Amino acid sequence: MTLRLSRRAYAEMFGPTTGDRVRLADTELLIEIERDFTTYGEEVKFGGGKVIRDGMGQSQRVAADVPDTIITNAVILDHWGIVKADIAIKHGRIAAIGKAGNPDIQPGVTIAIGAATEVIAGEGLIVTAGGIDTHIHFISPQQIDEALASGVTTMLGGGTGPATGTNATTCTPGPWHMERMLQAADGWPINLGFLGKGNASLPQPLVEQIAAGAIGLKLHEDWGTTPAAIDNCLSVADDTDTQVAIHTDTLNEGGFVESTVAAFKGRTIHTYHTEGAGGGHAPDILKVCGESNVLPSSTNPTRPYTINTLDEHLDMLMVCHHLDPSIAEDLAFAESRIRRETIAAEDILHDLGALSMLSSDSQAMGRVGEVIIRTWQTAHKMKVQRGALPEDNTRNDNFRAKRYVAKYTINPALTHGIAHEVGSIEPGKWADLVLWEPAFFGIKPSMILKGGMIAMAQMGDPNASIPTPQPVHYREMFATRGGALARTSLTFVSQMAADAGIAERYGLAKRIVPVRNCRNVTKADMIHNAWRPSISVDPETYDVIADGQLLTCEPATVLPMAQRYFLF
């Protein structure tokens, strides 16, 4: 007998299906389900009187033949699509995306459920890949809790704690500090990778940091980012298949942006805060967005451009770069970096896919828990101010959503050589997954999985009779305890360090994963974010011209995903 359900009734029971639309939080962004992998009438759902019971939706297969965990009827939002599916997890990895159930009695089943299978109800939830923040100043370990609670599951950067050097630069300098930080990484339920200090004009001081475990090198103007240092650093990176991140020369002491681009010599490099407020050739570092070898990112304080953006930046910059407001030269240095015109253009360059990534700059002119929020606030602002993208239609913002989710998932993974493990929801990848209620999308995840195990979740009073009574807040779960921690998170290192046996030498508990293919990636590989405009910045007015068009927009006076969701 066939029972017909209204779309509303179906969505309330099994989640939205093909053609249904979902609003992302309180934004103007709507996504539409492009495909439903489940079979109508054969959906699986757990609970009293529901489908996943012995002999019904649960088969008799043994553990080897079934997933460890199934997320049922979830909406997947990833760079490759927006679909409804069941997600299978096995041995800490995504095993399949498809239709779960009992193949002995149900048609179209691609994922068998058994007695060894745990169930996470994904009905009505959105699942994204764990976020990747590639601009971390490791100033305080407490950042990790904030990042994880926001949906970030991988942190890449440098530092040694609240040292003056780390407060300003994302570098873990030298083999001794690298070893200590890699040992510290064993204590945190998040994937970590560290950048060494790249500012040297001879190879050996850099090579020894790569050999000690650095996944790449960071060039920072506060250490002297001269053309000679850039050239040497990129040569070492080419020899070791590691990435280089750069904060260029704001003062133009060692040369102008053209000098820096010339020092690149066509070699791949990740440019941090490419707009320039976070640092870089004033006023025209944005020009590098047009280079095929440059992988450009933003940091989140300028995202998106609002009526408050300029006011907060000056004081923030003075503190982060150890400047003295009573010294005229220090004040001029700070003021040269804060330009409303380039910040406004940054919004549009993100929307058009010229800026490929977004990161935090944690505690050093950036907020570690707001990468995802500010990404989607930027997308919303651009939808309101610029309308639908040409690739989208009047019904949905699917392409825009794919473009923006790629900025903090797959593109950072490709840039830093870790896309073979993380960065997207695809079979074979590490099961770092974030579950969201649509009303709280991008703001407050319901649950964060690390390596297939629940690491953090919104949880009520532990003494209550059920999980939901107040106070509900983020609490660490079992993936963060004991030996499970080391088996559900990864530490990224260089291939050179892995081959040298640092895991045994340092006594590391976490699995180490070498980065790879860092030197082959180009701007063309930045998914949905590969536009290479010819950019000029007027040295007097700071107006930004891209392919002959002036890029400007008004500051936002109000934003979604803000005070509606937070008390403070």
Swiss-Prot record:
PTM remark: Carboxylation allows a single lysine to coordinate two nickel ions.
Enzyme Commission identifier(s): 3.5.1.5
GO CC, alphabetical: cytoplasm
Reactions the enzyme catalyzes: urea + 2 H2O + H(+) = hydrogencarbonate + 2 NH4(+)
Protein name as annotated: Urease subunit alpha
Annotated family: Belongs to the metallo-dependent hydrolases superfamily. Urease alpha subunit family.
Compartments, as annotated in UniProt: Cytoplasm
Pathway field: Nitrogen metabolism; urea degradation; CO(2) and NH(3) from urea (urease route): step 1/1
GO MF term (any one): urease activity
Modified residue annotations for N6-carboxylysine: 218
Annotated organism of origin: Burkholderia lata (strain ATCC 17760 / DSM 23089 / LMG 22485 / NCIMB 9086 / R18194 / 383)
Entry keyword Phosphoprotein: no
Alphabetical list of InterPro entries matching this protein: Amidohydro-rel, Metal-dep_hydrolase_composite, Metal_Hydrolase, Urease_alpha_N_dom, Urease_alpha_subunit, Urease_AS, Urease_asu, Urease_asu_c
Named cofactor requirement(s): Ni cation
Annotated residues for binding of Ni(2+) 1: 135, 137, 218, 361
Binding-site residues, Ni(2+) 2: 218, 247, 273
PANTHER family per UniProt: UREASE
Top-level taxon in the UniProt lineage: Bacteria
One matching Pfam family: Amidohydro_1
Residues where substrate binds: 220
